[in-house]
């Protein structure tokens, strides 16, 4: 996901095959996005990597190893949503909501239009010194409405037609703007 964000992708998300409702929502949202959608899918393979993502899909471990990214909602996780993530500058930190030191109002509120925060989320599990310190995020990391190549191309063609007319291929080929290559 970090590579997709670094390549300036306009829709970046992650989902898993074992959660049919979530995968349907993410694929539908990616399909509706105007532009290219990059969606990482954690998919089990019974032959080559059976159970590789089970820590994120099993009912017993999923609540403590994953966090669902929902626009406008705080990043909470845990068996009873007792943990949350705060952002201090650009440094995320896991906090215990039962300690009394933090409330849900103190937590990081997910904003999928913030590229900087999306980059931070994409690296939650990449620190080898702190294995499973952060939960694995699932959902839409980043989305941006922006023009696409097709938009610009069609605009250019429409402008040329408006300025120069429809054009005539036969007139172009028979006109004086051609040349002959001789040996």
What are these regions (language model features)?
Residues 64-65, 69, 74-183:
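Conserved acidic/glycine
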Residues 1-113:
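Glycine-rich ThDP/TPP pyrophosphate-binding loop and its adjacent helix/strand module
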């Amino acid at each position: 996901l970090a590579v997709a964000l670094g390549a300036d992708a306009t829709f970046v998300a992650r989902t898993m095959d074992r959660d049919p409702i979530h995968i349907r929502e993410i694929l539908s949202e990616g399909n509706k996005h105007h532009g290219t959608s990059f969606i990482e899918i954690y998919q089990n393979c019974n032959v080559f990597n059976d159970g590789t993502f089970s820590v994120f899909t099993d009912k017993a471990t999923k609540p403590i190893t994953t966090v669902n990214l929902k626009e406008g909602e705080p990043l909470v996780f845990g068996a009873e949503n007792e943990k949350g993530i705060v952002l201090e500058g650009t440094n995320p930190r896991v906090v215990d909501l039962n300690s009394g030191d933090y409330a849900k109002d103190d937590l990081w509120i997910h904003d999928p239009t913030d590229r900087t925060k999306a980059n931070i989320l994409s690296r939650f599990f990449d620190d080898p010194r702190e294995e499973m310190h952060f939960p694995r995020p699932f959902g839409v990391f980043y989305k941006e409405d922006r023009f696409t190549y097709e938009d610009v191309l069609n605009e250019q063609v429409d402008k040329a037609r408006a300025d120069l007319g429809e054009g005539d291929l036969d007139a172009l080929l028979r006109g004086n703007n051609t040349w002959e290559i001789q040996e």
